[in-house]
Amino acid sequence: MGGRTSPKVRVLLVDDLPDIRLVMRLLLEADGRVEVVGEAAEGSEGVRLAGELHPDAVVLDLRMPGMDGVSALPLIRDAAPGAVVVALSALPVGPMTDRAIDLGATYIRKPDLRRVVNLVGSLARSGPEPPKPKRPKRMGPAAA
């Protein structure tokens, strides 16, 4: 995973909501094997930090003002090619989440932050091979 120099999984948080970033930081760092190395409130800031910090994982909100997560995702992949990207959104599965998955992100619906912690924690256990992105099942009227 992108030449990890630290024994901890290095994570970049990109979400416009400060409370989500705070809770994610507290949950992730409580694991002891994860270090949040940066935070961004907007996609373009996340792209810049990904290039500077070279994180092992990026937790990326899909809906943000300015550059959204779907637009930022390929640029983050270019800036930090080895990083696993976990896309977060309160949106149900649909075109935006499908696009993120097609770009190689693992999608987790807010507020299931414990799944994010489990996924990022698994990187510390599994070493350089990131888990494969999973496409969630469509449910309800959106499935039509």
Q: At which residue positions do the language-model features occur?
A:
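Acidic catalytic/metal-coordinating carboxylates
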Residues: 42-45, 68-71
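Active-site beta3 strand of CheY-like receiver
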Residues: 53-59
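Non-catalytic signal-transmission and effector/linker regions of two-component phosphorelay proteins
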Residues: 1-10, 114-144
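Alpha4 helix (beta4-alpha4-beta5 surface) of REC/receiver domains from two-component response regulators
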Residues: 71, 91-118, 122
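Receiver (REC) domain active-site loop signature in two-component systems and cognate sites
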Residues: 64
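A short, hydrophobic beta-strand element within the central beta-sheet of small alpha/beta folds
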Residues: 82-94
